[in-house]
Structure formats: C-alpha cells, structure tokens
Amino acid sequence: KEYGGFYTQDQIRDVINYAAERHITIIPEIDMPGHTRSMIAAYPHLSCFGEKTELCQFGGIFEKILCPGKDETFEFIEKLLTEVCALFPDDRFHIGGDEAPKTEWKKCPHCKARMEALGLTDYEDLQGYFTKRVVAILKKHGKRAVCWNDVLESKDVDTGNIIQYWTAQHEAPVPAFIERGGKVIFSNMSALYFDYPHGINSLNKVYHYQPVVMGKSYADSPNMLGYEAALWSEQVETPEHLEELLFPRLYAVSEIAWNEAGDYADFEHRAEKKIEIAAKQGVNCMTKDGWNPEGEARVQSAATFIAHMMNPGGIGTPHTDAEREMVRPVIEKFAQIWFRPQDVPEMMKNDDLVGAALNFMKMFPPENDETKGK
C-alpha cells in the first residue's frame, strides 16, 4: 500500500538539531478537533458517525471533526501525543482549536450524552471540555498547550495555556483572558499572515503592525509574548514563491518584534541592502516594486489570490462538481467574511469572482487599514 509523505523519528530529530544549531526552536502543532480531515480519513471511527471519508485534495473548513463524545477519540490522541511529545524537547505544543464547526456534534448521540453527563448546554463548552482533556494529556508529558484564540469562546480557559491571536472574529474574550494573566502570541491575519500577497498585507502594513485587540494596545503588556508571522502553504506553488512571500516582510516583523517600529523609509533602505545580500545567496525576494502595491496593482494582487484560492483549477481547490459541492459551505463562509453581502451571490459564479474581488478591495484602500500608522 502506498502512503503519502512522512518523517521518520530520526528525520524529525535531525530537523530539530539542525534548527537548534541555528538558534531556532521547533514547536509542533497538531490541530484538533477541527482541521482533522486526514486523521478521520485514516480513522473514520474518530468522527461522530464513523462514515468513510475521502482524503481531501484541497484546503478548507470541513464539518467532519473529532468526536469529543467518544472515549476512543481521547485514547487515540493520548497515543499520538505520547509519541510526538517524546520527539520535541521544547515544553510547548500547539493543539490548534480553530475553525471547528459544531454541525455534526449537534446531531451526534455521543456528544449529546457527553454534554448531559457534564451538565453542558453550549457546544463551545463541549470544545472547552475537549481542550481540557487534551491539555491534561500534554501536562503528563511536561508540555504546555498553545491554542488559537477560537478556544476562548468556551468558559474559563486555563491561563496556563498560551493563546495565539489570529482572528478578530473571536477577539471579544481575549482582553479578559489577558487580564486574568493569560499569555498571548499575536499573529493577526490582517497583517502577519504571509501567505496573503503584498496587496493584502503590504510591507508597510506589516512594519506598522500593533498588537491591538478591541481597540486596546497590548504592546507594553507583560502578558504579550511577542509576534509570530504565519504562512500556510496551500496556495504556495514553489520554493521560489515561498521566498517571495517571506522576504522582506519577515525582516519587518523581526524588527518590530524586538524593537518599536522606527522610520519606515530608513527600514526600506536597510531592507534593500538585505535583499541584495539574500539574492546573492540564491533567495528569491519580492522586488521593491511589489512591496506596497497601490491602486489597481493592489486590487489585482488581492483579487488574483482570492480567485486562485476559490476557483476550480487553482492550487489546492476543488476540481470536480462533486468536490466543489463538498466544499461549498466553506466558499460561502469565505465569501461572507471577505465580501459585501451583495457580492456573495456573485462569488458563487466562477466568471464573476475576480470582479467581486475588485469591488471589495476598492472599498478598503491601504490608508484605511487599522494597523497602518499606529
């Protein structure tokens, strides 16, 4: 039987040692209970209804997630984490917790029984229970959990967990968590997501990013651990494309993470020198004319990315009618997040996608970005 790519334990150790020699710490992430489609494709019984699920060939948010009502779910997680924790020396372990639709949980007899036994009425609190069970497993191995800020929708999240703030959709509970002493890493998608093109997250925007939640800055808070730029690879076609997305934006976030932002023109001048050196080493940096796209160039940069993400034929997107129907709720949700209500119907028509993107981006010129100039 053929399998996809994997690392042996010795290869993992080699990567960890290689990174450590360069003063880099590798922290593993196994996202759960959502973003587990591959896990469920291999072990269908871990989902609510145990239905066979094909391994998906494109990214998205899917309704089939791990079932917190089944004891075998936690038995599997314990075996998995026991093996993986032993490989990574750092005391932090990321368990995700983001984008976990409760659609199947609401129909699942196992979840219903679990909620009744625990006296729960809110499915977010069922995820909170799931998180606590996984955190308890990690603690047995001397690990501290890192979670996306979605998990704060459940009550009384342990401040021993580290929260990674990525989305304003679930920002309301973040200030209270910080006030209770909880530690937060800032990775706001509106500036620090580097799979987004420069037309969405420009170099200027990254350089002026501030850790603001609900209108309050946490730049001086002792509970703000720092920044982390994220780059998800579903839409990254080649190593050269990866490097173009990273540099010089990674220079910007490195500078502001260790210091306050200074004069942007001075930073740009230094960035030019850095990419000259990097280019001589074979690194494919974004050229200066692409750092801060304006006008139609900015709009086209963003529109191309969105069209690439959502249209059949793009990297990691559904190619058949059946696949497109399977991911349709994800596309509709994405459209509702990024577009005006009147654009959503047009989003579902392939030939009008870029037009809708153009209309949307024209509504938000760079000077209106919340992070610019702060």
Regions picked out by a protein language model, each given a short descriptive name:
Residues 1-143:
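Substrate-binding cleft of carbohydrate-active enzyme catalytic domains
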Residues 8, 127, 165-166, 267:
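Charged, low-complexity surface patches
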Residues 100-101, 325, 369-372:
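Intrinsically disordered, low-complexity regions of eukaryotic proteins
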Residues 144-161, 167-364:
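Flexible, acidic glycine-rich loops studded with aromatic residues
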Residues 360-374:
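Long, low-complexity, intrinsically disordered segments
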